[in-house]
Amino acid sequence: MLQTNRLSINAIGKIKKNWIREGINQYKKRMPDLIINESKSFNIDNIRVNNIIICLTEEGQSFNSIELTSLLLNFKNKKINFLIGDADGIPSDIKDKSNLLLSLSPLTFPHELARLILIEQIYRAISISNNSPYHRA
């Protein structure tokens, strides 16, 4: 079973659009243990060595929701840190240190919207792993 206390989202910048913030808050109510950090830059040195680092980037690998759930479950009891850059993306030195480059879609999304989509996919993955009716494939 996938647990939110093993997951964190680290993002550059703050959400400015109210409708995106409201959407994120709706999912946060469902997943209160999910950690979301907003900062001006990434400090990858603060991420523990045995944690999994997944960078969201347009050149990353794409998964459907079932595949993403399986991937996250395969990381067993490790903590998983998702990194979302700003409009300029994630610096290449940080991408080089990641365990996985993940693309949410072949389409390009504003970084604020990417956060909302990622949070929904995390909620969906948790629902899939719990056999909840939220995901109807």
UniProtKB/Swiss-Prot annotation:
SUPFAM superfamilies: alpha/beta knot. The keyword Iron does not apply. GO terms for molecular function: rRNA (pseudouridine-N3-)-methyltransferase activity. Pfam families: SPOUT_MTase. Keywords: Cytoplasm, Methyltransferase, rRNA processing, S-adenosyl-L-methionine, Transferase. The keyword rRNA processing applies. S-adenosyl-L-methionine binds at L56, G85, L104, S105, P106, L107, T108, F109. InterPro entries: Alpha/beta_knot_MTases, RlmH-like, tRNA_m1G_MTases_N. It comes from the Bacteria. It catalyses: pseudouridine(1915) in 23S rRNA + S-adenosyl-L-methionine = N(3)-methylpseudouridine(1915) in 23S rRNA + S-adenosyl-L-homocysteine + H(+). It is an enzyme of class 2 (transferase). Its main location: cytoplasm. One of its GO terms (cellular component) is cytoplasm. It is found in: Cytoplasm. HAMAP family: 23SrRNA_methyltr_H. Belongs to the RNA methyltransferase RlmH family. Specifically methylates the pseudouridine at position 1915 (m3Psi1915) in 23S rRNA. This is Ribosomal RNA large subunit methyltransferase H. It comes from Prochlorococcus marinus subsp. pastoris (strain CCMP1986 / NIES-2087 / MED4).
